[in-house]
Structures are given as structure tokens and as C-alpha cells.
Amino acid sequence: MTGSVTQKKWDRIASFYKWSNGAAERRWEPWKSSLFSKMGAGNILFLAIGIGEEIRLFPENRRITAIDISPRMLEKAKEKAIGYNGSIRLMEMDARNLSFSSETFDQVFTSCTFCSVPEPIRGLKELYRILKPGGELRMFEHTRSNHFPFREILWCDRHGR
């Protein structure tokens, strides 16, 4: 979905994203570190790598494919990916239309992503499609969503249900 409204939005903010989001990223770092510590030795997909700020939190020696809808965000992530002690392949891709074959990945990780996916159910179906049988989807979300089922899941989580 090259040229989509979502892609244009992230391209526009790529140059100042770190400045605008730094405090929040520091606040969420303990939870993200815990999430990323679950990265196994298999084939891993990281959805919405952005400018690559989270790469420094990844365990070493992993094989990761990291995608983002924004070419400008990916450009910013390149230097961090090069410095990673493992393998990171950066690709431009929309979560709603993944170009991977079915049952490709052992694990999929997302961090603060689905609040920005215009059709989150479609995106989740794509993640399910590309996960191997028994594969894991691990997510960190930071905000309320107006999309079903995230709205209900996040409400239940906040209220202990």
C-alpha cells in the first residue's frame, strides 16, 4: 500500500520522531526489554521497526526481519541495524498485506504498532497467516484503541478481567 495515508504520515514524522517520542520510549523500556528477551533462535519478524530505536534492546545473535510501512523510517533504522550483533533485514511493507509466504516465521513481535494500523483485524490475520504452526505473536501496546477487539481486550486488561 505504497503511498497510503499511513505511509505518508510516518514519512513526514521520521525526521523528528526520536525527539517527539523519547520520553515515552524511556518509560516503556523495561516492558519492551522484557518482551524482546523472549526472542528465540528461530525466524523472527519485527513489525513496524520505525527508526530502529528498539534494536539496542534485542538479544544478540538473532535472525530478524524488520518491516515498516515508511521508507524514511527504514532509512533512519539502517545505521542501528548495521550495528546489531546478529542479522536484521529491513523491508518496506504494510502489515495489512505481507509479502511473505504462509508459515514463514516462528515468532512475530510488535511494539506500539496496532494503534496505527488502519485495519487491525486484517493486520492480525496476516500475522496469523505468516506464523508457523505453534508460532508466537508477542505484542506491547501502549494506548487505547478504537478498533474491536483491541478496545475490549485492553479495557479488560486494565480492569483485571
Labelled PLM ranges:
Residues 45-97:
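Class I SAM-dependent methyltransferase SAM/SAH-binding core
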Residues 43, 63, 134-136:
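Short glycine-centered segments of the SAM/dcSAM-binding site in methyltransferase folds
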Residues 4, 20-24, 138-161:
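C-terminal alpha-helical "lid/dimerization" subdomain adjacent to the S-adenosyl-L-methionine
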Residues 121-136:
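A short glycine-rich, Lys/Arg-flanked "PGG" loop and its adjoining helix->strand segment in the class I
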Residues 23-42, 53:
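Conserved alpha-helix/loop element of class I SAM-dependent methyltransferases that forms part
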Residues 96-108:
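A short acidic, Gly/Pro-enriched loop at the edge of an enzyme's catalytic core
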Residues 1-15:
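N-terminal, positively charged/glycine-rich alpha-helical extensions of SAM-dependent methyltransferases
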Residues 107-119:
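A short SAM/SAH-binding and catalytic strip from SAM-dependent methyltransferases
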